[in-house]
Swiss-Prot record:
This is Glyceraldehyde-3-phosphate dehydrogenase. GO terms for cellular component: cytoplasm. One of its GO terms (molecular function) is 4-hydroxy-tetrahydrodipicolinate reductase. D-glyceraldehyde 3-phosphate binds at residues 139-141, 194-195. The keyword Cytoplasm applies. Pathway: Carbohydrate degradation; glycolysis; pyruvate from D-glyceraldehyde 3-phosphate: step 1/5. It comes from Methanoregula boonei (strain DSM 21154 / JCM 14090 / 6A8). The keyword Cytoplasm applies. Keywords: Cytoplasm, Glycolysis, NAD, NADP, Oxidoreductase. The active site is at residue 140.
């Protein structure tokens, strides 16, 4: 049983904690918060020991009715693996602690590739991650791109990918971010960071990405165009999506053509937090003509990396020998079936 510490119990951390707790081969030994808030009370309700970075704030936690188990360093000492889910650019500052303690650690996509020297996706490079001390799980957008690009590459060969990311402005609980009434190019320059990030996992893929931010909180939307080496076949593309455990197919019969409807569907399915771990690829958008493949896919920014974190833990602790086995273990423990099989 692998002992896992969650350093940063926020949007991603709380989801990873619940996903880890659901597994049969790992357990949560603690989570960390910087201040008492609603998420800290959820951690208490879940039975996760609560640790804090600054022990001078212990009184504030205890006044709020939250028992403090110790410092973040205490938590890390007790763990086999540390999932760093602190905000972007904060995680890298925690690396010296993990190194000092000789612990395995994994970071999120908000950190640069260099923090770990290895960027991870369960479907693409699981075997290369086995036994590593440090791993970076790529961002939500990069995760979604890697999953589908890798499958298309295996089936038809990829000559070039052009992807446009229409990104949500903020997560639902982020009240200090926007925009409220604007479409913001982020960045104005081409490529956006997503293309080079894909290449940290799939270095042989030629890819150009562009990105913008829009006033919504639900999900990201990708418009993807792939030039293939072999002539592409629409039916075969649909089949490879259906056969992948982390790719969902939004069928015409569902009548869904927006991220809002997707999230409503996830709620009706009874998904915890209405989370969508899978790429949500719109079947009607799949266009194949000679060597050109186009489609839309929606990516739930709060959720798709959660299952990847669990698989990364298995890889670095050698609990599984390949990605297929780990993905099945993770999905089964979460009772997760891609949405293509629900309508």
């Amino acid at each position: 049983m692998i002992k896992v510490a969650i350093n940063g119990y926020g949007t991603i951390g709380k989801r990873v904690a619940d996903a880890v707790a659901a597994q049969k081969d790992m357990k949560v030994i603690g989570v960390s918060k910087t201040r008492p808030n609603a998420e800290a009370f959820i951690a208490k309700q879940r039975g996760y020991p609560l640790y804090i970075a600054d022990l001078s704030k212990k009184a504030a936690f205890e006044k709020a009715g939250l028992t403090v188990a110790g410092s973040v360093e205490d938590m890390c000492k007790a763990a086999d693996v540390i999932v760093d889910a602190t905000p972007g650019d904060i995680g890298v500052t925690n690396k010296p602690l993990y190194e000092k303690l000789g612990k395995k650690a994994l970071w999120q996509g908000g950190e640069d590739h260099e923090v770990a020297g290895f960027s991870f996706n369960s479907s693409c490079n699981f075997k290369d991650a086995i036994g590593r001390q440090f791993i970076r799980v790529v961002s939500c957008n990069t995760t979604g791109l890697c999953r589908i690009i890798n499958e298309v590459d295996k089936a038809f060969g990829v000559e070039h990918v052009h992807a446009i990311m229409v990104r949500r402005g903020s997560d639902p609980g982020e009240i200090k971010k926007g925009p409220i009434d604007a479409v913001v190019l982020d960045p104005v320059t081409v490529p956006s960071h997503h293309g080079p990030d894909v290449q940290t996992v799939l270095p042989h893929i030629s890819i150009t990405t562009m990105a913008m931010i829009v006033p919504t909180t639900m999900m990201h939307m990708h418009a993807v165009r792939i030039t293939t080496k072999k002539e592409v076949n629409r039916e075969k593309v649909i089949e490879l999506i259906k056969n992948h455990p982390r790719l969902g197919l939004v069928k015409k019969s569902a009548g869904i053509k927006s991220t809002a409807e997707l999230k409503e569907f996830a709620m009706d399915l009874g998904r915890q937090r209405a989370d969508l771990y899978e790429n949500c690829i719109f079947e009607d958008s799949i266009y194949a003509n000679k060597n050109e493949l186009c489609f839309f896919q929606a990516i739930h920014q709060e959720a798709d990396v959660v299952v990847e974190n669990v698989d990364a833990i298995r890889a670095m602790t050698s609990l599984a020998n390949d990605g297929t086995a780990s993905i099945k273990l993770t999905n089964d423990a979460l009772h997760f079936v891609p949405i293509q099989n629900n309508h």
